[in-house]
Swiss-Prot record:
Cleavable signal peptide: 1-21
Keywords assigned: Host nucleus, Secreted, Signal, Virulence
GO CC annotation: extracellular region; host cell nucleus
Lineage, top ranks: Eukaryota, Sar, Stramenopiles, Oomycota, Peronosporales
Domain of life: Eukaryota
Biased composition (Basic residues): 107-123
Disordered as annotated region, ranges: 105-142
Coiled-coil residue windows: none
Protein name: Secreted RxLR effector protein 76
Family the UniProt entry places it in: Belongs to the RxLR effector family.
Motif (RxLR-dEER): 48-65
Subcellular location field: Secreted; Host nucleus
Gene: RXLR76
Domain comment, as recorded: The RxLR-dEER motif acts to carry the protein into the host cell cytoplasm through binding to cell surface phosphatidylinositol-3-phosphate.
Keyword Transmembrane listed: no
């Protein structure tokens, strides 16, 4: 469930200087072989906590209730809003069936000229019937069976053309369904976000981390960009220590100096940031949020398919 880690990191860098894992010192990656993807986010949320910005227990409790309940509810409802996978599978099966019929259709279409030729020969068949009494009648009768066979091919050719048309329509419908499914998913997730996030942000005390999360992380899900490059971890060798130090330094600038991600986590976070921008802090934040959006969206789709 990679998206959960990315969105958590984005919240850390964008919204709060106090988000961390159970140790209060470091983030922890999700282990794909430990938790099922469909339950990774919701099950792990209660096991994490949001440190109080003023180290007050009441403040901590408020943040924990507000932020994690919002995230869990948003994810649950967002998943429930996803289009039914069965409908998509059914459309794909229709398309597959139509495509399987295409070779037969093509073969029948090849015979179509014979059918047309047979149609042109039909008057000759009548003439053959009329001249049965002449010596050449026997020859005309011999030609009749192939003629009848060609005439029989005409309905098959028409049926084949219908199969080709249905295959084309099914392919077009499937492409249109994918676009509609994507739009429905985004709209549903956006509705869930507004429903669960807005009330919690309005009720949170000014200055609390949960209030800052609500006010600083403004995501319009239908505008999510999903064409980012794939995440790649780098081998954490001694020569990469400069990169690790740079990420830690960035964490101190944007977050809390005590937040120290592991070397493996740094390798992912490094690829999420935008180091070449003219304003690194600004571009770091923007790129992290976009990466989080992309991977959470992909995770939601994967959860629905399971």
């Amino acid at each position: 469930m990679s998206g959960a880690f990315y969105v958590f990191t984005a919240l850390l860098l964008v919204a709060s200087d106090q988000i961390a894992a159970e140790s209060g010192k470091r983030l922890e990656m999700y282990k794909h072989d430990v938790m099922a993807a469909s339950n990774a986010v919701v099950k792990s949320l209660p096991n994490r906590f949001l440190r109080g910005s003023r180290d007050e227990p009441d403040n901590l409790a408020n943040e924990e209730r507000t932020v994690y309940s919002v995230l869990a509810s948003m994810i649950n409802e967002g998943v429930s809003k996803m289009p039914c996978a069965a409908e998509v599978v059914e459309k794909i099966s229709h398309t597959t069936e139509a495509v399987e019929n295409m070779p037969r259709a093509a073969k029948a279409v090849k015979k179509r000229p014979r059918g047309a030729k047979a149609g042109r020969k039909m008057p000759r068949a009548a003439e053959a019937e009329a001249v049965k009494k002449v010596p050449r009648a026997g020859t005309a009768v011999k030609k009749a069976p192939p003629l009848a066979e060609d005439v029989k091919e005409m309905p098959r050719a028409k049926e084949a053309m219908e199969e080709l048309r249905r295959a084309a329509d099914a392919t077009e419908d499937m492409q249109r369904a994918k676009a509609n499914d994507l739009l429905k998913a985004l709209i549903g997730a956006d509705e869930a976000l507004k429903k669960h996030w807005t009330p919690s942000g309005n009720t949170a005390a000014i200055g609390d981390t949960s209030y800052d999360v609500f006010n600083k992380v403004i995501l319009s899900l239908p505008e999510w960009k999903i064409n980012f490059r794939g995440m790649k971890s780098m081998a954490v060798l001694d020569q990469h220590r400069e990169n690790i130090d740079l990420v830690h330094k960035t964490f101190e600038i944007l977050c809390d100096k005590n937040v120290k991600p592991t070397a493996a986590e740094v390798s992912f976070i490094w690829s999420m940031m935008e180091w070449k921008g003219p304003n690194p802090e600004k571009y770091h934040r923007r790129n992290l949020v976009r990466q989080a959006q992309r991977y959470v969206f992909l995770d939601l789709r994967n959860v629905k398919k399971r």
